[in-house]
Amino acid sequence: MIRKINATIEDFEDEKVLIKIGVLTLEAYPSLNVIRYFKKGDQYEFFASLEISEWNTSLYIFKDKIERDVFESLKKVSKIGPRIASKILRKTDAEEFIQMINSQDTALLSSLPGIGKKTAERLISELSNSFSAYSTGADTQSYGNNNLKEAIEALETLGFQRYEIMKVIGQLDLEDLKTEEIIKECLTRL
């Protein structure tokens, strides 16, 4: 089993990335954070997962252990598998995904590729206890409240990435804060 790879990014192609390890160039499926934070020529020790089936061998690479752990948990959910798990982690940050599961947000989960309402409900029921080790401060607060949702949408409109917003929100005491106050607090920390 391959767990980590020290590799150099050679090129990005559609859903894949070419990585060079010594004299070998391999094709891998990257997570959103690999796409977001790395560019051609960067060398990094990626977390990895090698999936072998009778039809295919696929390598998936991740920026950190949390992403790989989320991928490993996702692919075990019935009717998900590594392909859909990879597509999910190319559209959302692992911490944001954990937040969606912990807050039981079927609407946000349903917006991910390959996920409908029933699959979102299945993800919540099968993964609800899987990410307690990765919970953030925002998990214990009312993520579902309208003020917070409106603040997140406003900050995204201003150009901030959701994963950045969620990290800051995890540091805040959201009790009784209005939308404007949440935005103001986030802007001072972003």
Curated annotation (Swiss-Prot):
Residue ranges of the region described as Domain I: 1-63
Molecular function GO labels: ATP binding; four-way junction DNA binding; four-way junction helicase activity
Listed GO CC annotations: cytoplasm; Holliday junction helicase complex; Holliday junction resolvase complex
InterPro entries attached to this UniProt entry: Hlx-hairpin-Hlx_DNA-bd_motif, RuvA, RuvA_2-like, RuvA_C, RuvA_C_sf
Keywords: Cytoplasm, DNA damage, DNA recombination, DNA repair, DNA-binding
Primary location group: cytoplasm
Domain of life where this protein originates: Bacteria
Region (Domain III): 143-190
Task of the protein: The RuvA-RuvB-RuvC complex processes Holliday junction (HJ) DNA during genetic recombination and DNA repair, while the RuvA-RuvB complex plays an important role in the rescue of blocked DNA replication forks via replication fork reversal (RFR). RuvA specifically binds to HJ cruciform DNA, conferring on it an open structure. The RuvB hexamer acts as an ATP-dependent pump, pulling dsDNA into and through the RuvAB complex. HJ branch migration allows RuvC to scan DNA until it finds its consensus sequence, where it cleaves and resolves the cruciform DNA.
Entry domain remark: Has three domains with a flexible linker between the domains II and III and assumes an 'L' shape. Domain III is highly mobile and contacts RuvB.
Summary of subunit composition and partner proteins: Homotetramer. Forms an RuvA(8)-RuvB(12)-Holliday junction (HJ) complex. HJ DNA is sandwiched between 2 RuvA tetramers; dsDNA enters through RuvA and exits via RuvB. An RuvB hexamer assembles on each DNA strand where it exits the tetramer. Each RuvB hexamer is contacted by two RuvA subunits (via domain III) on 2 adjacent RuvB subunits; this complex drives branch migration. In the full resolvosome a probable DNA-RuvA(4)-RuvB(12)-RuvC(2) complex forms which resolves the HJ.
Record-stated family: Belongs to the RuvA family.
Protein name: Holliday junction branch migration complex subunit RuvA
Organism listed in the record: Petrotoga mobilis (strain DSM 10674 / SJ95)
Taxonomic lineage of the native organism: Bacteria, Thermotogati, Thermotogota, Thermotogae, Petrotogales
